[in-house]
Amino acid sequence: FPIRKPEQIVDILKEKGLPLPTKLMLEGDELPYTEYVRLAGLFPDAEVVNGTPLIRQARSVKTAIEIEMFRRSGMAHAKAYEQIPFAYYPGMTDIEFSIEIERLMRLQGCLGIFRVFGRSMEIFMGSVLTGDNAGYPSPYDFALGGRGLDPALPGGADKTPLKEGQSVMVDLGGNFNGYMGDMSRVFSIGKLSEEAY
């Protein structure tokens, strides 16, 4: 049955002569409070329990189809990364290089958006870091930093020019067919110095 809004579920169950649930499991850790109350209110006689732990456990076990989808996602991601050295041209900034890499990813089928936790956390594709910006700390709970283009998103590329003799860290996520992966590689523009700094 096509369902446009949750309220239709009650009508369909009644129409088909099916019993209303006595126990309702909702993702209590992830649903906004108002949505939780709305859904629970559809079945006022049902016991409502937090189903998040069970749902997470079920999602942690992958079917053969899901494993194949991850494999295909990884292959598309790797295919885009193989083209990265050819996307560089002298005079580019890190943001220009990032845009070119994102273009390569999208051409391989990357969806370009990443929902990573519940309904309210999405991340950008990732970071291309070089020069002093590569050592800039992150305000977030992940390894890479960078100043970013704006305080609204303080992470990633910041228009640093790419220069001969520099390393370039490319760490982009890929969301292909709804299955996400992450890939990090370090490239160099010309020969790198033996010393890190």
Features from the language model and the residues they span:
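Active-site neighborhoods and metal-handling regions in enzymes and metal-associated proteins
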Residues: F1-Y197
